[in-house]
Amino acid sequence: MAAVIDNEMLDDILAQVRPLLGQGKVADYIPALASVSGNKLAIAICTVEGQLYQAGDATERFSIQSISKVLSLVAAMRQYEEDEIWQRVGKDPSGQPFNSLLQLEIEQGKPRNPFINAGALVVCDMLQSRLSAPRQRMLEIVRQLSGVSDLSYDANVARSEFEHSARNAAIAWLMKSFGNFHNDVATVLQNYFHYCALKMSCVELARTFLFLADKGYSSHHAQAVVTPMQARQVNALMATSGMYQNAGEFAWRVGLPAKSGVGGGVVAIVPHEMAIAVWSPELDDTGNSLAGVAVLEKLTQRLGRSVY
């Protein structure tokens, strides 16, 4: 019989995984992230019934980085017809590093999916075309979904990323050369880096992403965020592309739709049941949280949960 969730079980899982701390590496290509202590470990679970469970550093905020790509995609889904989005970005795994230009050149400026950097930049370009204040709108979205009114961007992280943005700028200009990028590159990059610099805790992330476990409905402000079909589509993209080139290994070990960020966070969804957020800043070779993935693996084994 599968275990019942409680805080004691989560504490036990973190204790089992804690020996992994020190075996990964904190992201150092963004100086503002390199200063984060690697000795952090956290988990929070929010269920569709409204229960919240947590352990470790679950209320400490960190830079969510690429987890924000799910939120920007959801924002675009609310502004554009389906065909308008998917004619500019694909739905397939890339099998390449998240900041690769090679595949983008070969495939004439159309990114494989919205969760690699190129795809997320196209989505941000689309938001720039439709929203008068894209950064403020994103803050409004996460504040509504989380029920937390003081969520904000980490200006130091956003500035640090912009100062080291040569590769992302190259990606944007390459797509512009193929006609798949319409706005000012620097403006869109600033929006993109601010989204990545959102500071949230595991508790806030689990609450924010609960709508993906509940057919697109957010209980925190009692309305649909996306349609049930759109929620299913986002979960499918997370399952195939949310963990970069490690998606297959993650599906094997954990078996849930998930999205990671180089800040060490991972959000995972058990459809119809719960949203899970874990955090540990040290990364593996593919840019995913080393201990965070291990926590999710042990959790799904304990609970007997998988979408496969």
UniProtKB/Swiss-Prot annotation:
Enzyme class (EC, first level) = hydrolase
Coiled coil start-end: none
* Catalytic reaction annotation: L-glutamine + H2O = L-glutamate + NH4(+)
Kindly give the InterPro entries that the UniProt entry links to this protein.
Beta-lactam/transpept-like, Glutaminase
Entry keywords, A to Z: Hydrolase
GO biological-process terms attached to the record = glutamate biosynthetic process; glutamine catabolic process
| Signal peptide interval | none
Annotated EC: 3.5.1.2
Look up the domain of life of the source.
Bacteria
Which positions are annotated as binding substrate? 66, 117, 161, 168, 192, 244, 262
Q: Name one GO molecular function term.
A: glutaminase activity
Q: How does it assemble?
A: Homotetramer.
Which family does this protein fall into?
A: Belongs to the glutaminase family.
PANTHER family with a match to the protein in the record: GLUTAMINASE
Q: What is this protein called?
A: Glutaminase
Q: Which gene encodes it?
A: glsA
